[in-house]
Swiss-Prot record:
Gene3D superfamilies: Bira Bifunctional Protein, Domain 2, GAD-like domain, Nucleic acid-binding proteins. This is Aspartate--tRNA(Asp/Asn) ligase. One of its GO terms (biological process) is aspartyl-tRNA aminoacylation. CDD domains: AspRS_core, EcAspRS_like_N. The record marks 31, 83 as: Important for tRNA non-discrimination. It is an enzyme of class 6 (ligase). ATP binds at residues 221-223, 230, 491, 543-546. Residues 199-202 are annotated as: Aspartate. InterPro entries: Aa-tRNA-synt_II, aa-tRNA-synth_II, aa-tRNA-synth_II/BPL/LPL, Asp-tRNA-ligase_1, Asp-tRNA-ligase_1_N, Asp/Asn-tRNA-synth_IIb, AspRS_core, GAD-like_sf. Its EC number is 6.1.1.23. It holds the Pfam family GAD. Keywords: Aminoacyl-tRNA synthetase, ATP-binding, Cytoplasm, Ligase, Nucleotide-binding, Protein biosynthesis.
Amino acid sequence: MFRDKYCAEVKEEEIGKEISLCGWVFRRRDHGGLIFIDLRDRTGIIQVVFSPEISIEMHQKAHGLRSEYVIAVKGILKKRPEGTENPELITGNVELWAKELEILSFSKPLPFQLDEMAEVSELLRLKYRYLDLRRAEMQKNFLLRHRITMAVRNFLDSKGFVEVETPMLTKSTPEGARDFLVPSRLNPGTFYALPQSPQLFKQILMMSGFDRYFQIVRCFRDEDLRADRQPEFTQIDFEMSFVKPEDIIEIVEEMLFKCFKEVLEVDIEIPFKRLTYEEAINKYGSDKPDLRFALEIQDVSELVKNSQFKVFLDTIEKGGVVKAICGKGLASLSRSEIDKLTALAQSFGAKGLAWIKVKNGFESPIVKFFSESLLREIAEKVGVEDGDMILFVADKKSLANEVLGRLRLEIAERAQIKKEGFYFAWVLDFPLFEWDEEEKRFVSMHHPFTSPKDEDIDKLLKIPQEAFYDPQSSVKDIKAKAYDIVLNGYELGGGSIRIHKADIQEHIFRILAISEEEIKRRFGFFVEALRYGAPPHGGIALGLDRLVMVMTGANSLRDVIAFPKTQKAFCPLSEAPSEVNLKQLRELHIKLDI
């Protein structure tokens, strides 16, 4: 063994003892006679002192040490002289006086200093990820990720779940994001797909009698990236037989409660708040509302009917709505700043943005169209105070909700009104389908294997084929046995009770405009499995990366994934994806056409 213990495990009780340690040179300071080294490993830092009085040879050797050299040292632990203690270090009251030093490996000059990260670009950090990961902040993130994963595994094991691995090379059944395809050398012209989720296999495991399955599983989606998305990601995935939504909701709440308690020593409040999909959209303009602040969207259509403002009246007459939100603290905005806010709303799809400042009364070009009493009624409904601004969007209900929902987040960011803590919610009663204007057909709000609510099944089976292509048909009214879990404005996970009868599953496929031939080709194996005695079952998948991101307070998923991709799905460290040689392509019977 190179060492007796980790750096931060050294205790004051060991003063006077000989100790061997290993790690990286974090800092080196030459104070004339003495050389001080901050020795770092994954647990922390300890100060090592080289003195010519102890060993001239080791002292001279220490002169050559540079940042990130890997060394082994042996020495006597001493108490630091009074006044030189470092309260920021666990080991700040002691130091190791070295009598032996071995340089295990050298380091080139660093592209950036590990303790000065503010000015370092993310691209450079990702290129030298092995250096970036040495930083205490990153080490902390991944140790916490490990503890979260272990807490989840232990909890699910205690509840009778069985961990089963599902295939990484599977069939392409695209319904949503693009698949990552893998060509088959042994079956020329055919392709595997990397799984977007283990959906079909975990359902088949329920049909196989496993009753309770879980997996910490890698998933892959070829989609445009943003701060909370990666092409490969990890899910906490589980499925249960003979359950109702309430059973799964209770398991998830208990699991997360124990996870936060064990890992962060935080008591989250359970049961979580519950919202219907309609309520979430109407109040917050999003099906993943951030509940760290209030600012609910209000429908003021009935009130503004009593105004003389033609823009509002015309919108209502055409079947639209007028909705408003409190612009917290925005009454101080200049006209040019309001114009920028209007441009932002327009970038979200709004035709414009009406506003009224609440500042010792009401100020706006449009106040002349409202009576004083009406303005007070609107202000009361929207919940504004002196110093705030009322922001209005007049349009179709869906667009007004979306625009104000996005402005709501912008306002909260500007006003710095997000509360500290973890704010969970369940979103329930989703529509089973939504209309895709581009494809002119209904698509699944979640996925095609989500069960309709019991009271909607007969209605669903009686929907005639011509209604499948009518956005106003009764298809839009069918509700799903689905439940999404939201944390601080992030969709943490989604689940549902699944369809366990072949006839209902086939009917869903038809509503989704999937032909009989396509059903057989893409999902035939799955529909066949449903004909051999499938139990009622349901499950959920939670995004482990997102959970860790929120629990650590990280700004991006890239700070909690060891080797992430950029927003162009590129790995600066390995330079993947990369070209392959012609021999490999020929073996796969692939010819490029770029």
